[in-house]
């Protein structure tokens, strides 16, 4: 009966895919972490990765707590993301995914806690984009 719950929000499979895309961006951070010559970028890549993982874990637990556990077949790591070696751009990519979920979840008052979680994540990623400007790691500017 899960289908009736999702009438006004994005497809459950799309939510699951979005969650696993976020995890892949966390892995992308590790690629930056290992390949950079900048100590600042090395440390920031791990900070960004930890932020993404913590947020994604909380997002998944909260979403599945409200809508129910996904079936194993609803989950896949076979996702396509825009791989990048620019931490600022990577932060924006994760915010774009979270914002798509926020737009739909904002329609349901009972999901206000998840909307707040997403808003906090967006603020955290904005700070990380700013920190990435130090040592010229990135000159990326967050979208308004």
Task: Briefly describe each language-model feature range.
Residues 40-71:
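Conserved alpha-helical segments that form or flank metal/cofactor-binding pockets of metalloenzymes
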Residues 30, 53-54, 110, 130:
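Extracellular secretory-pathway ectodomains and N-terminal mature segments of eukaryotic proteins
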Residues 1-9:
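Compositionally biased low-complexity segments enriched in polar/charged residues
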Residues 18-34, 59-62, 94-102, 124-136:
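Long, well-ordered alpha-helical segments
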Residues 10-25, 80-83, 87-90:
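Disorder-to-helix initiation segments
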Residues 24-47, 104-111:
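Helix-loop segments that flank and shape redox-cofactor active sites
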Residues 65-69, 131-144:
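Long amphipathic alpha-helical segments
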Residues 75-129:
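Acidic/histidine-rich alpha-helical segments that form the ligand environment
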């Amino acid at each position: 009966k899960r289908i009736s719950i999702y009438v006004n929000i994005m497809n459950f499979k799309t939510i699951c895919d979005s969650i696993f895309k976020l995890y892949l961006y966390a892995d992308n951070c590790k690629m930056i972490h290992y390949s950079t010559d900048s100590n600042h970028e090395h440390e920031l890549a791990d900070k960004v990765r930890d932020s993404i993982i913590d947020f994604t874990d909380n997002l998944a637990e909260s979403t599945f707590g409200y809508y129910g556990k996904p079936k194993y077949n609803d989950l896949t790591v076979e996702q396509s993301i825009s791989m990048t070696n620019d931490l600022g751009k990577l932060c924006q990519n994760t915010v774009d995914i979270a914002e798509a979920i926020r737009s739909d979840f904002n329609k349901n008052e009972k999901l206000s806690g998840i909307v707040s979680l997403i808003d906090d994540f967006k603020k955290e990623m904005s700070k990380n984009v700013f920190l990435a400007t130090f040592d010229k790691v990135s000159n990326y500017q967050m979208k308004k």
